[in-house]
Protein backbone atom coordinates (compact mmCIF):
# COMPACT_ATOMS: atom_id res chain seq x y z
CA UNK A 1 0.00 0.00 0.00
CA UNK A 2 2.84 2.39 0.86
CA UNK A 3 5.70 1.46 -1.45
CA UNK A 4 3.77 0.44 -4.60
CA UNK A 5 0.48 2.35 -4.55
CA UNK A 6 1.61 5.19 -2.25
CA UNK A 7 -1.85 5.45 -0.68
CA UNK A 8 -0.68 7.00 2.63
CA UNK A 9 1.35 9.64 0.80
CA UNK A 10 -1.63 10.55 -1.39
CA UNK A 11 -3.96 10.76 1.62
CA UNK A 12 -1.60 13.28 3.19
CA UNK A 13 -1.98 15.39 0.04
CA UNK A 14 -5.78 15.68 0.30
CA UNK A 15 -7.20 19.18 0.73
CA UNK A 16 -8.21 20.00 4.31
CA UNK A 17 -10.88 22.73 4.41
CA UNK A 18 -11.35 22.69 8.19
CA UNK A 19 -10.78 25.97 10.02
CA UNK A 20 -9.61 24.20 13.17
CA UNK A 21 -7.35 21.17 12.76
CA UNK A 22 -6.70 19.71 16.21
CA UNK A 23 -6.18 16.27 14.65
CA UNK A 24 -4.23 15.92 11.38
CA UNK A 25 -6.25 14.82 8.36
CA UNK A 26 -4.11 11.71 7.91
CA UNK A 27 -4.80 10.55 11.49
CA UNK A 28 -8.51 10.44 10.67
CA UNK A 29 -8.68 9.35 7.04
CA UNK A 30 -6.14 6.51 7.18
CA UNK A 31 -7.85 4.70 10.09
CA UNK A 32 -11.23 5.17 8.36
CA UNK A 33 -9.83 3.55 5.21
CA UNK A 34 -8.40 0.61 7.15
CA UNK A 35 -11.60 0.07 9.13
CA UNK A 36 -13.65 0.14 5.92
CA UNK A 37 -11.32 -2.49 4.46
CA UNK A 38 -11.89 -4.57 7.61
CA UNK A 39 -15.66 -4.07 7.15
CA UNK A 40 -16.46 -2.42 10.46
CA UNK A 41 -20.15 -1.53 10.36
CA UNK A 42 -20.15 1.79 12.20
CA UNK A 43 -17.88 4.73 12.99
CA UNK A 44 -19.38 4.62 16.51
CA UNK A 45 -17.84 1.19 17.00
CA UNK A 46 -14.41 2.65 16.35
CA UNK A 47 -14.45 6.23 17.53
CA UNK A 48 -17.11 6.50 20.24
CA UNK A 49 -18.07 3.31 22.08
CA UNK A 50 -15.76 2.61 25.05
CA UNK A 51 -15.95 -1.12 24.40
CA UNK A 52 -14.47 -0.53 20.96
CA UNK A 53 -11.02 0.16 22.40
CA UNK A 54 -10.13 -3.53 22.30
CA UNK A 55 -11.46 -3.84 18.74
CA UNK A 56 -9.07 -1.27 17.30
CA UNK A 57 -6.10 -2.90 15.58
CA UNK A 58 -2.91 -1.93 17.35
CA UNK A 59 -1.13 1.15 15.96
CA UNK A 60 -4.07 1.96 13.66
CA UNK A 61 -4.95 5.15 15.51
CA UNK A 62 -2.08 7.15 16.91
CA UNK A 63 -2.27 10.12 19.21
CA UNK A 64 -5.58 11.69 20.17
CA UNK A 65 -8.64 9.57 19.33
CA UNK A 66 -11.03 11.67 17.20
CA UNK A 67 -14.68 11.88 18.13
CA UNK A 68 -17.16 10.55 15.60
CA UNK A 69 -18.44 14.09 14.93
CA UNK A 70 -14.91 15.19 14.01
CA UNK A 71 -14.65 12.24 11.61
CA UNK A 72 -17.95 13.13 9.94
CA UNK A 73 -17.02 16.80 9.71
CA UNK A 74 -13.73 16.06 7.96
CA UNK A 75 -15.13 13.45 5.57
CA UNK A 76 -17.98 15.78 4.54
CA UNK A 77 -15.43 18.44 3.54
CA UNK A 78 -13.15 16.25 1.42
CA UNK A 79 -13.59 16.74 -2.33
CA UNK A 80 -14.81 13.40 -3.81
CA UNK A 81 -12.91 14.20 -7.02
CA UNK A 82 -9.63 13.95 -5.10
CA UNK A 83 -10.60 10.50 -3.78
CA UNK A 84 -11.65 9.40 -7.27
CA UNK A 85 -8.27 10.47 -8.65
CA UNK A 86 -6.40 8.45 -6.00
CA UNK A 87 -8.51 5.44 -6.99
CA UNK A 88 -7.90 6.03 -10.71
CA UNK A 89 -4.14 6.26 -10.11
CA UNK A 90 -4.30 2.95 -8.21
CA UNK A 91 -5.99 1.32 -11.22
CA UNK A 92 -3.23 2.76 -13.44
CA UNK A 93 -0.59 1.06 -11.26
CA UNK A 94 -2.51 -2.24 -11.34
CA UNK A 95 -2.65 -2.10 -15.15
CA UNK A 96 1.01 -1.15 -15.44
CA UNK A 97 1.98 -4.07 -13.21
CA UNK A 98 -0.22 -6.40 -15.32
CA UNK A 99 -2.23 -7.50 -12.30
CA UNK A 100 -5.37 -7.97 -14.42
CA UNK A 101 -3.59 -10.54 -16.59
CA UNK A 102 -3.70 -12.95 -13.66
CA UNK A 103 -6.88 -15.00 -13.41
CA UNK A 104 -8.19 -14.23 -16.88
CA UNK A 105 -10.80 -16.39 -18.62
CA UNK A 106 -9.15 -17.82 -21.71
CA UNK A 107 -6.82 -14.83 -21.75
CA UNK A 108 -9.70 -12.33 -21.57
CA UNK A 109 -9.96 -9.78 -18.74
CA UNK A 110 -13.58 -9.95 -17.59
CA UNK A 111 -15.37 -7.27 -15.56
CA UNK A 112 -18.88 -7.21 -14.15
CA UNK A 113 -21.21 -4.21 -14.04
CA UNK A 114 -24.23 -3.79 -11.78
CA UNK A 115 -26.20 -1.27 -9.75
CA UNK A 116 -25.89 -1.00 -5.99
CA UNK A 117 -27.85 1.02 -3.43
CA UNK A 118 -25.62 2.86 -0.96
CA UNK A 119 -28.00 4.62 1.42
CA UNK A 120 -31.70 5.15 2.11
CA UNK A 121 -33.69 7.23 4.59
CA UNK A 122 -37.13 8.80 4.98
CA UNK A 123 -35.68 11.64 7.09
CA UNK A 124 -32.25 12.60 5.76
CA UNK A 125 -31.59 13.76 2.22
CA UNK A 126 -29.27 15.88 0.10
CA UNK A 127 -29.62 17.63 -3.29
CA UNK A 128 -28.14 14.58 -5.05
CA UNK A 129 -30.56 12.05 -3.51
CA UNK A 130 -32.87 9.97 -5.68
CA UNK A 131 -36.41 9.54 -4.37
CA UNK A 132 -39.24 7.00 -4.41
CA UNK A 133 -42.39 6.08 -2.50
CA UNK A 134 -42.00 3.19 -0.06
CA UNK A 135 -44.64 0.69 1.07
CA UNK A 136 -46.29 3.22 3.39
CA UNK A 137 -46.34 5.87 0.62
CA UNK A 138 -43.68 7.93 2.38
CA UNK A 139 -40.99 9.55 0.28
CA UNK A 140 -37.76 7.63 0.67
CA UNK A 141 -34.43 9.20 -0.28
CA UNK A 142 -31.55 7.07 -1.47
CA UNK A 143 -28.27 6.99 -3.34
CA UNK A 144 -27.60 4.43 -6.04
CA UNK A 145 -24.59 3.92 -8.26
CA UNK A 146 -23.41 1.66 -11.05
CA UNK A 147 -20.20 -0.20 -10.27
CA UNK A 148 -17.80 -1.79 -12.74
CA UNK A 149 -15.45 -4.34 -11.26
CA UNK A 150 -13.23 -7.31 -11.93
CA UNK A 151 -13.55 -10.16 -9.41
CA UNK A 152 -11.40 -8.33 -6.83
CA UNK A 153 -10.92 -4.72 -7.97
CA UNK A 154 -13.47 -1.95 -8.53
CA UNK A 155 -12.59 -0.13 -11.75
CA UNK A 156 -14.97 2.71 -11.02
CA UNK A 157 -18.47 3.75 -10.04
CA UNK A 158 -20.97 6.26 -11.37
CA UNK A 159 -23.61 7.86 -9.17
CA UNK A 160 -27.11 8.04 -10.61
CA UNK A 161 -28.50 11.57 -10.69
CA UNK A 162 -31.90 12.96 -9.69
CA UNK A 163 -34.05 14.81 -12.20
CA UNK A 164 -36.29 17.81 -11.65
CA UNK A 165 -40.07 17.89 -11.84
CA UNK A 166 -42.13 14.88 -12.83
CA UNK A 167 -39.30 13.14 -14.68
CA UNK A 168 -38.08 9.88 -13.24
CA UNK A 169 -34.59 9.79 -11.75
CA UNK A 170 -31.78 8.40 -13.88
CA UNK A 171 -31.91 4.68 -14.54
CA UNK A 172 -29.15 2.15 -14.10
CA UNK A 173 -28.54 1.86 -17.85
CA UNK A 174 -27.92 5.59 -18.22
CA UNK A 175 -25.33 5.52 -15.45
CA UNK A 176 -23.77 2.35 -16.88
CA UNK A 177 -23.20 3.92 -20.31
CA UNK A 178 -21.64 6.97 -18.69
CA UNK A 179 -19.39 4.77 -16.54
CA UNK A 180 -18.18 2.70 -19.51
CA UNK A 181 -17.31 5.84 -21.50
CA UNK A 182 -15.53 7.38 -18.51
CA UNK A 183 -13.44 4.25 -17.85
CA UNK A 184 -12.53 4.02 -21.53
CA UNK A 185 -11.43 7.66 -21.57
CA UNK A 186 -9.49 7.44 -18.29
CA UNK A 187 -7.93 3.96 -18.52
CA UNK A 188 -8.08 3.02 -22.20
CA UNK A 189 -8.78 -0.68 -22.78
CA UNK A 190 -9.51 -1.53 -19.13
CA UNK A 191 -11.15 -4.93 -19.84
CA UNK A 192 -11.99 -7.28 -22.70
CA UNK A 193 -15.43 -8.57 -21.70
CA UNK A 194 -18.23 -6.93 -19.69
CA UNK A 195 -20.61 -9.27 -17.87
CA UNK A 196 -24.07 -8.08 -16.88
CA UNK A 197 -27.53 -9.29 -15.89
CA UNK A 198 -30.66 -9.27 -18.03
CA UNK A 199 -31.38 -5.57 -17.46
CA UNK A 200 -28.42 -4.72 -19.70
CA UNK A 201 -29.76 -6.57 -22.75
CA UNK A 202 -30.46 -3.18 -24.26
CA UNK A 203 -29.46 -1.80 -27.68
CA UNK A 204 -28.00 1.57 -26.54
CA UNK A 205 -25.90 -0.13 -23.85
CA UNK A 206 -24.59 -2.81 -26.24
CA UNK A 207 -23.81 -0.13 -28.81
CA UNK A 208 -21.84 1.79 -26.17
CA UNK A 209 -19.76 -1.32 -25.48
CA UNK A 210 -19.13 -1.80 -29.21
CA UNK A 211 -18.02 1.82 -29.58
CA UNK A 212 -15.53 1.28 -26.75
CA UNK A 213 -14.15 -1.95 -28.27
CA UNK A 214 -15.63 -4.24 -25.61
CA UNK A 215 -17.31 -7.63 -25.88
CA UNK A 216 -20.13 -8.60 -23.55
CA UNK A 217 -21.79 -11.58 -21.90
CA UNK A 218 -25.35 -10.77 -20.80
CA UNK A 219 -27.74 -13.08 -19.03
CA UNK A 220 -30.92 -13.79 -21.01
CA UNK A 221 -33.78 -15.10 -18.88
CA UNK A 222 -36.98 -13.79 -20.48
CA UNK A 223 -38.45 -16.74 -22.38
CA UNK A 224 -40.76 -14.37 -24.28
CA UNK A 225 -37.89 -12.70 -26.13
CA UNK A 226 -37.54 -13.73 -29.77
CA UNK A 227 -33.81 -14.16 -29.25
CA UNK A 228 -34.45 -16.71 -26.49
CA UNK A 229 -36.96 -18.60 -28.61
CA UNK A 230 -34.62 -18.64 -31.61
CA UNK A 231 -31.73 -19.93 -29.51
CA UNK A 232 -33.90 -22.63 -27.94
CA UNK A 233 -35.00 -23.78 -31.40
CA UNK A 234 -31.36 -24.08 -32.48
CA UNK A 235 -30.50 -26.00 -29.29
CA UNK A 236 -33.20 -28.55 -30.10
CA UNK A 237 -31.72 -29.03 -33.59
CA UNK A 238 -28.22 -29.55 -32.16
CA UNK A 239 -26.88 -26.46 -33.88
CA UNK A 240 -23.56 -24.95 -32.82
CA UNK A 241 -20.99 -26.38 -30.45
CA UNK A 242 -21.97 -27.97 -27.16
CA UNK A 243 -19.94 -28.71 -24.06
CA UNK A 244 -21.21 -30.40 -20.89
CA UNK A 245 -19.60 -30.48 -17.46
CA UNK A 246 -20.51 -30.90 -13.81
CA UNK A 247 -20.10 -28.38 -11.01
CA UNK A 248 -20.82 -30.03 -7.70
CA UNK A 249 -24.21 -31.72 -8.04
CA UNK A 250 -25.23 -29.59 -11.03
CA UNK A 251 -24.94 -30.61 -14.67
CA UNK A 252 -24.19 -27.60 -16.91
CA UNK A 253 -24.45 -27.35 -20.70
CA UNK A 254 -22.70 -24.59 -22.63
CA UNK A 255 -23.70 -23.83 -26.23
CA UNK A 256 -21.77 -21.71 -28.72
CA UNK A 257 -24.21 -20.48 -31.35
CA UNK A 258 -24.11 -18.05 -34.23
CA UNK A 259 -26.23 -17.42 -37.31
CA UNK A 260 -29.50 -16.70 -35.54
CA UNK A 261 -32.48 -16.86 -37.82
CA UNK A 262 -34.29 -13.70 -36.63
CA UNK A 263 -33.22 -10.25 -37.81
CA UNK A 264 -31.06 -8.78 -35.02
CA UNK A 265 -29.96 -5.62 -36.82
CA UNK A 266 -32.37 -3.52 -34.77
CA UNK A 267 -30.82 -4.82 -31.56
CA UNK A 268 -27.12 -4.07 -31.93
CA UNK A 269 -26.74 -1.88 -35.01
Feature annotation, model-predicted:
Residues 33, 80-84, 190, 214:
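Short alpha-helical patches at protein termini and domain edges
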Residues 217-269:
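An anionic, glycine-rich sequence signature occurring as long contiguous blocks
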Residues 166-228:
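Domain-level cores of phosphate- or acyl-group-handling catalytic modules
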Residues 72-151:
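Active-site-proximal, Lys/Arg-enriched surface segment
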Residues 31, 46, 67, 71, ...:
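Short, conserved catalytic/metal-binding motifs centered on acidic residues
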Residues 150, 158-161, 198, 218-222, ...:
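Short, structured patches in soluble enzyme cores that scaffold and shape functional sites
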Residues 1-66, 72:
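Gly/serine-rich nucleotide phosphate-binding loop at the start of the catalytic core
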Residues 133-190:
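Electropositive, glycine- and tryptophan-enriched low-complexity nucleic-acid-binding patches
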